[in-house]
Amino acid sequence: MTRKERYTFILDYFGKKMPVVTTELNFGNAFQLLVATMLSAQCTDARVNMVTPALFARYPNAAEMAKAEVEEVLEYVKSVSYPNAKAKHLVEMAQMLTDAYGGEMPDSMDELTKLPGVGRKTANVMLAVWFEKPAMAVDTHVFRVSHRLGLVSDSDNTPQKVETTLMKNIPPSLASRAHHWLLLHGRYVCKSQKPKCDECEIKAVCKHPNPKS
């Protein structure tokens, strides 16, 4: 099977399996999506969704959070991973978003990554989910599944290299959905530890069947 055939097979499978797919994070506007995505770094979406209702009720937009003290925001996010750093970044992000962008979410990689606490992966989530632009956010699940399914080479050993290879081979119209397909497959089937290979419907093309990790 050529790489092109591999991509076609896998994308066709997911397109039929999950024709409609999006993030599992809960949000009501662009600011809230950015906050939830920042909180989700090295933390489960389920945990983030437990803390954001109260957080968003108190700080529904950037202008409100920009006025907050870090300690105040920390009280709402203390159950997520790295709460101190994340609370600090959230307040600083809200302040910059308010002061430099008038509360409007920037829609480019360069501008998004100027915001405190916003890296390439988070920016790609915003571009794909909120702005519906062709973008590929590579988290630990996407990275792992891409390698196991042979979508990328062993030399693609960084998230950005994986992103580049995926974007070269996935049609722009499918890029944002493909991110969610790979992520959800990694989250629920192709897990890091004890992957559910017996439940995997595309194991025939897996390059690492029954991996130990």
Language-model region placement:
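Catalytic cores of DNA base-excision repair glycosylases
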Residues: 2-213
